[in-house]
Amino acid sequence: MPKVRTKDLIEQFQLELVSGEEGIHRPIDTSDLSRPGIEMAGFFTYYPADRVQLLGKTELTFFDTLTNDQKQERMKALCTEETPCIIVTRNQDVPKELLQASRESGVPLLRSSQTTTRLSSRLTNYLEGKLAPTTAVHGVLVDVYGVGVLIIGQSGVGKSETALELVKRGHRLVADDSVEIRQEDEDTLVGSSPDLIEHLLEIRGLGIINVMTLFGAGAVRNYKRITLVINLEIWDQNKNYDRLGLDEEKMKIIDTELTKITLPVRPGRNLAVIIEVAAMNFRLKRMGVNAAQQFSERLMSAIELGNQE
């Protein structure tokens, strides 16, 4: 089922439906827009018919210079079975040739009072958000000191309990159990909760709790950009865990690589505090302060000094 249809644009941007009502359920499959200026001149070889078409003042002013036959020919070519809609901006008068072509082809003809540039920007942002690649990850997403921390790990390792402790310490829950993730651009992943389980947290032995009801509206968020992944796993004595923090592990979600930290779980370890420190340390690294690197440099300097003596 298409994520976006023409009728969604009409409702979202309060567009006036001039004609082509039978086509308002046409799907929109791309966030790219088209301003058919060169098509107005008669070049339709590479016409992107599957895009939303925007007709601004420039296009319609040039259109007025054409002959009557050219006007009819261009507008018929503009309205295809693939075209989701044509939007006339600035509340300009709709050419009668376009109105006729819209009625014959069933292409929705819409009108907006906004400028072409402004409407183009808003349409692009809206469509990119709706049509972005998505996936779902089993885990918990928490906003810790402004860092979107995705906590993953096998079932029963203590993800929800750790999230509860973080919420109790003043941080904000975004999603528990299932995190819906969409890629808004090349390096931006935004996580949110499915509507059915929004603001809910499942604690084994306690059941399902409503975080917003218990801790208030300040304890939850609807969505958050994900920048750090914490992987919880049962402590394995035969595995060598990172003790310096020099080697940075990565995890790929959709097309974006995120920093991943593996935390071994064993009795007595306060995971909530460790995750808080991991989030703060991550922010420091992004600001150029790397404690592990500084220690390594000091160690190498001490070794070199010792060798000289």
Swiss-Prot record:
Active site: residue positions: H138, K159, D177, R243
Q: Describe the reaction catalysed, as an equation.
A: [HPr protein]-L-serine + ATP = [HPr protein]-O-phospho-L-serine + ADP + H(+); [HPr protein]-O-phospho-L-serine + phosphate + H(+) = [HPr protein]-L-serine + diphosphate
Q: Function, please?
A: Catalyzes the ATP- as well as the pyrophosphate-dependent phosphorylation of a specific serine residue in HPr, a phosphocarrier protein of the phosphoenolpyruvate-dependent sugar phosphotransferase system (PTS). HprK/P also catalyzes the pyrophosphate-producing, inorganic phosphate-dependent dephosphorylation (phosphorolysis) of seryl-phosphorylated HPr (P-Ser-HPr).
What this protein is called in its record is HPr kinase/phosphorylase
Outline the segment boundaries, as ranges, of region: Important for the catalytic mechanism of both phosphorylation and dephosphorylation. Answer: 201-210
Report the gene name: hprK
Write down the species.
Bacillus cytotoxicus (strain DSM 22905 / CIP 110041 / 391-98 / NVH 391-98)
The yes or no answer to whether the keyword Acetylation is present is no
**Where are the coiled-coil regions?**
none
Positions contributing to ATP binding = G153, Q154, S155, G156, V157, G158, K159, S160
* Region listing for Important for the catalytic mechanism of dephosphorylation, in residue ranges: 264-269
A Gene Ontology biological process term: regulation of carbohydrate metabolic process
